[in-house]
Amino acid sequence: MSTRNRFRFACFMAAMIAFPAIASAQSPQLGQPIAPADIAPWDISIGPDGAGLPPGRGTAALGEAIYAAQCQACHGEKGAGRPNDALVGGKGSLAPGKPPLKTVGSYWPYATTLFDYIRRAMPFQDSKSLDPDQLYAVSAYILHLNEIVGKDDVLDAETLPKVKMPNRDGFIPFPRNP
C-alpha cells in the first residue's frame, strides 16, 4: 500500500472513530419537552378492565334515540347494517365452515372496546362529538340489540367492564413482551 493510500486510510479510520462522538454531541434542538398535563387530554385509551373510562352513565332506553339520530344512517335500523357494517347478529358464525359475520355481539371480546371505538371514531362525520352519557347510552343500546344487556341496565365506568361479551374467550392471549 502506498503512503498516499495509507494516509487516506488513516484519515478514514480517524473519521470513523470520531463520528459517533461528534454525532452524539450535536442535537437538532427541535421542539420542547411536553408536560404530562399537556398529554392528558390526548390520552383517551380505555383498557379491557375499564381503566380510563370517564364518569357518566346511560341505558339502552336512552341510547335508542341517539342511535337513530347519529348511527342509523350508516349502520341501519337496529344495527342490521347497510350501507356500512352490521353491528348486530352473527351469533355462532365464527364456527368452522361458516362465513363469519364479525359484529359487536359475535366477535368483539370486550364491551369497553365498543365504548372506546365509538368515542374515538363515531359518528363518522363528527367523531368525538358524543359526551360520555351519550357514549354509555349508545353502547348500551348496541349491546341490548345483541341481547347482552337489558334495556334498562345502567352502564357506567363500573358496570361496563363487567359486561361479559359472548366471544370474550374466543381469542388466544398473545404476550407482547415475553
Regions found by a protein language model. Give the residues of each.
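Bacterial N-terminal signal peptides that target proteins for export
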Residues: 2-12
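The canonical Cys-X-X-Cys-His
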Residues: 63, 67-77, 87, 138-142
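Bacterial N-terminal signal peptides
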Residues: 10-21
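Gly/Gly-Pro-rich "capping" loops immediately C-terminal to redox-active cysteine motifs
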Residues: 60, 64, 80-119, 123
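Flexible coil segments in periplasmic/lumen-exposed cytochrome c-class electron-transfer proteins
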Residues: 36, 125-178
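Boundary at the C-terminal end of the N-terminal hydrophobic targeting segment
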Residues: 23-27
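Electrostatic cytochrome c docking/interface patches
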Residues: 30-66, 123-126
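Extracytoplasmic/periplasmic, Sec-exported soluble proteins
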Residues: 55-59, 106, 110, 127-130, ...
